[in-house]
């Protein structure tokens, strides 16, 4: 993919940084890259790409809001040395003041979640053409977007395939650089990348230089899912009070670490905090209201787990608003995230050039926390609902039953 500027009256691209992490095959990065007249190509290679663009959006310049948006198409970890963990679905965090429809309040800011890309939720901040661009990106990319005083940083993540030459070039109006790397060493503490860093002249778009580089940094996340035996299941039979079972029987306590499960629940479910006791619970957790009486998207909760055992979290379903679509069930889904978090002696949030900022449950931990991903599984439950076309019959039957009961009681009393 060659570098193309994103220009509009409502947003202007200022900088572009493309990072390519190639799969290792015994050859150096220099052997895999071709430079032809200032255009860098990477033929017959596979790997991962972080495509970062910094844009200026004038309509946001006077607003103090900080906004962090992420979008992930699947529930797998997909953690790489150039991509931190992005939770499944569509997540927004903001410190905006005032109320925002469907957002829930937490001590650190307002939060919104959906398992589909909700472009309508972005219209409060962004011009329509920018939202349309993000919607197109969401079809084939994972996204991580931050907004600070008019500057919007858009990070797109996708795979490099060996049938794509992946040309990289400069432009006349955008400051452009590219990094092409592969992993030298990687463990739970440090990551080392080596390769080439290329820059282009702003104004002419001509290649300035490509130079060899090597650097070390600390990652805030490590993927332990392939080494773990942590399963996420629904206890059978599944009913209106589904029980999520988190199997940590193969895990043992770790010094300075705790195991956790994080839930983004849609409003069709709630947690009884006196039954399943969460460490944190924000959002809609009223025990009686039906889903259509709630204003927020649902709730978020964090549970501390016990290693060496099967942990259970009991959910409760709400009454679903009747519809006339002919279906007796409504499909509701949620995706629990299981991980363990450890205290370290350094501020990890400032140690990686690829880290974009706190997402999801990270907001509730200190900057010196290291996260280890264990599992994230999408769960779907069919909830019963009434057919609204039968409302009159149901109301008449209910009224008749009430009248019969009253008459029966009167007869027994007198």
Swiss-Prot record:
Q: Which residues cross the membrane?
A: 391-410
GO CC term (a single one)? glycosylphosphatidylinositol-mannosyltransferase I complex
- BP term (GO), one: GPI anchor biosynthetic process
The pathway entry for this protein reads as: Glycolipid biosynthesis; glycosylphosphatidylinositol-anchor biosynthesis
> Molecular function (GO) terms listed?
mannosyltransferase activity
* Membrane topology, record value: Single-pass type III membrane protein
Question: Which keywords does this chain's UniProt record carry?
Answer: Endoplasmic reticulum, Glycoprotein, GPI-anchor biosynthesis, Membrane, Transmembrane, Transmembrane helix
Q: Which residues lie on this side of the membrane: Cytoplasmic?
A: 411-414
Topological domains, Lumenal? 1-390
Question: Does the entry feature the keyword RNA-binding, yes or no?
Answer: no
Glycosylation positions in this chain? 44, 95, 169, 375
- Please indicate which superkingdom the organism of origin belongs to: Eukaryota
Where is it located? Endoplasmic reticulum membrane
Q: Any idea what job this protein has? A: Required for proper folding and/or the stability of a subset of proteins in the endoplasmic reticulum. Component of glycosylphosphatidylinositol-mannosyltransferase 1 which transfers the first of the 4 mannoses in the GPI-anchor precursors during GPI-anchor biosynthesis. Probably acts by stabilizing the mannosyltransferase GPI14.
Q: Family membership, please give it.
A: Belongs to the PIGX family.
State the protein's name: Protein PBN1
Quote the gene name from the UniProt entry: PBN1
């Amino acid at each position: 993919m060659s570098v193309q500027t994103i220009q509009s009256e409502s947003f202007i691209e200022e900088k572009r940084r493309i990072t390519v992490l190639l799969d290792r095959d015994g050859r150096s990065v220099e052997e895999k890259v071709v430079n032809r007249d200032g255009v860098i190509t990477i033929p017959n290679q596979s790997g991962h790409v972080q495509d970062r663009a910094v844009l200026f959006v004038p309509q946001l310049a006077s607003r103090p809001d900080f906004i962090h948006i992420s979008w992930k198409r699947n529930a797998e970890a997909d953690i790489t040395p150039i991509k931190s963990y992005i939770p499944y679905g569509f997540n927004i965090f903001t410190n905006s003041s005032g109320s925002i429809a469907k957002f829930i309040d937490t001590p650190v800011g307002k939060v919104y979640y959906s398992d589909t890309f909700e472009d309508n939720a972005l219209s409060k901040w962004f011009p329509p053409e920018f939202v349309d661009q993000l919607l197109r990106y969401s079809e084939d990319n994972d996204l991580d977007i931050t907004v600070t005083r008019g500057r919007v940083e858009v990070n797109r993540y996708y795979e490099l395939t060996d049938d794509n030459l992946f040309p990289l070039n400069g432009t006349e109006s955008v400051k452009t650089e590219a990094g092409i790397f592969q992993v030298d060493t990687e463990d739970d503490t440090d990551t080392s990348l080596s390769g080439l860093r290329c820059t282009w002249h702003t104004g002419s778009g001509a290649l300035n230089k490509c130079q060899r580089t090597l650097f070390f940094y600390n990652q805030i996340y490590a993927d332990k899912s392939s080494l773990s035996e942590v399963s996420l299941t629904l206890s059978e039979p599944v009913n209106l009070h589904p029980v999520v079972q988190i199997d940590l029987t193969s895990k043992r306590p770790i010094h300075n670490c705790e195991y956790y499960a994080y839930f983004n629940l849609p409003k069709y479910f709630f947690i009884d905090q006196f039954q399943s006791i969460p460490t944190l619970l924000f959002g809609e957790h009223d025990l009686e209201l039906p889903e259509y009486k709630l204003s927020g998207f649902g709730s978020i909760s964090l549970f501390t787990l016990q290693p060496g055992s099967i942990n259970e979290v009991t959910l409760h379903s709400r009454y679903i608003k009747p519809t006339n679509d002919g279906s007796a069930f409504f499909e509701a889904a949620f995706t629990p995230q299981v991980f363990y978090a450890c205290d370290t002696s350094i501020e990890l949030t400032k140690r990686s050039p690829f880290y974009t900022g706190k997402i999801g449950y990270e907001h509730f931990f200190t900057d010196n926390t290291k996260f280890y991903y264990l599992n994230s599984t999408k769960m779907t439950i069919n909830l019963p609902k009434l057919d609204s076309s039968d409302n009159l019959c149901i109301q008449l039957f209910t009224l008749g039953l009430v009248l019969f009961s009253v008459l029966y009681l009167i007869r027994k009393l007198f």
